[in-house]
């Protein structure tokens, strides 16, 4: 085994910084928050696999791999013998890699732990990209809209920008091959490749179609954004990855330079990330020698403390943290620390509640095992697992911004009874249609609303909620969320 790390788990595919209405796939069911500028996928409840805290900098209580007792050794020998027998004596030729993976998957599944999993080499690569914020590609944010892959925006200074790619360019081919009917993640995979290799995109701009050659480079996706909104500085932290603490420090210094005293740290739908970054970020506001998080395993406890003085420019700032049910893991470590030390007031809705930590062990073949090893507590000893952190001031998220994605493989019609039908009703209500109930029943009244929606959006009027209707429905909800951030607006009004 190579490289032991402690983690509490995050699987964030950068996918050329891709966003998608329907086609962004994960390894499990997903819940989508229509937050401001994009779909942000999180995995909720017993199926969560994201929201990673990766404890790279801390070796917990000098953990050592202990020897096996006789029973364990006998069990291990049995597993080895079964593998050998099936690999050599089974009447049909077997793939040894698949047998090995099946055995590992079986052991991990037996844990009945949604945070523990075995990742293949390819999955490990995506996992590591999510932690580092680095990937090889062209640096273009994409989304699927009206069954077309459209460039939302090229990243500043990226190969895509230098090659002349513009917002709203529609990609029709990759390396001469049509992408019609492909899911967004499939297109992203085609666009990505090895560093310093070229990819040719055929893009449609208005009535013109042309080929654009772009050299792939290593791209770093920033995790922190700063905006000035009146007399309030809004710092959005999307995840905790390598150097998020440095990005946060820069944002705080910019706010100070702008003369702002009131700062909002927006952690909504932030699934977590590196624990050492969460500690460094807390250290911007909390003085040296203070406990940020406590790690516990059995009777053993270790307090992780700040190592530097707090940033002097941040000392006089009025800090507000904005969270929701998608704020998890390292987000909760950071929020819990600032809350316990009265360094920030927390607004929004209750956080996810993930208080356990995973360890990752990477193997020589590039695969990785991730398993729960310990739990964590806030400085005051609060264990938030399954409970979350309650805000000091509740600001509810509009229902439509917390809807489950409706599978576009399903069609709903009169007489159907399904939980997705409630989602349809909530969404239509948000789009201005008069919905008389939020039941799971597809009744005549809903059929009439669907017909009205289809007619208004120049779709075939069937009264059935089909794939085309679903795509337009999702697109309009995303646009609405992008234009109106009701929760943030309410908080800024409170701070005035």
Curated annotation (Swiss-Prot):
It is an enzyme of class 3 (hydrolase). Gene3D superfamilies: 2-enoyl-CoA Hydratase, Chain A, domain 1, 2.30.42.10, 3.30.750.44, PGBD-like superfamily/PGBD. Residues 1-27 are annotated as: Disordered. The chain crosses the membrane at residues 39-59. The lineage of its organism: Bacteria, Bacillati, Bacillota, Bacilli, Bacillales. Belongs to the peptidase S41A family. This is Probable CtpA-like serine protease. Residues 1-16 have a biased composition (Basic and acidic residues). One of its GO terms (biological process) is signal transduction. The active site is at residues 329, 340, 354. Keywords: Cell membrane, Hydrolase, Membrane, Protease, Serine protease, Transmembrane, Transmembrane helix. CDD domains: cpPDZ_CPP-like, Peptidase_S41_CPP. GO terms for molecular function: endopeptidase activity; serine-type peptidase activity. It comes from Staphylococcus aureus (strain MRSA252). Its main location: membrane. It is a single-pass membrane protein. One of its GO terms (cellular component) is outer membrane-bounded periplasmic space. It is found in: Cell membrane. Residues 124-206 form the PDZ domain. InterPro entries: ClpP/crotonase-like_dom_sf (IPR029045), CtpA/B_N (IPR055210), PDZ (IPR001478), PDZ_6 (IPR041489), PDZ_sf (IPR036034), Peptidase_S41A (IPR004447), Peptidoglycan-bd-like (IPR002477), PGBD-like_sf (IPR036365). It comes from the Bacteria. PANTHER family: CARBOXY-TERMINAL PROCESSING PROTEASE CTPA, TAIL-SPECIFIC PROTEASE. Residues 17-27 have a biased composition (Polar residues). Its EC number is 3.4.21.-. SUPFAM superfamilies: ClpP/crotonase (SSF52096), PDZ domain-like (SSF50156), PGBD-like (SSF47090).
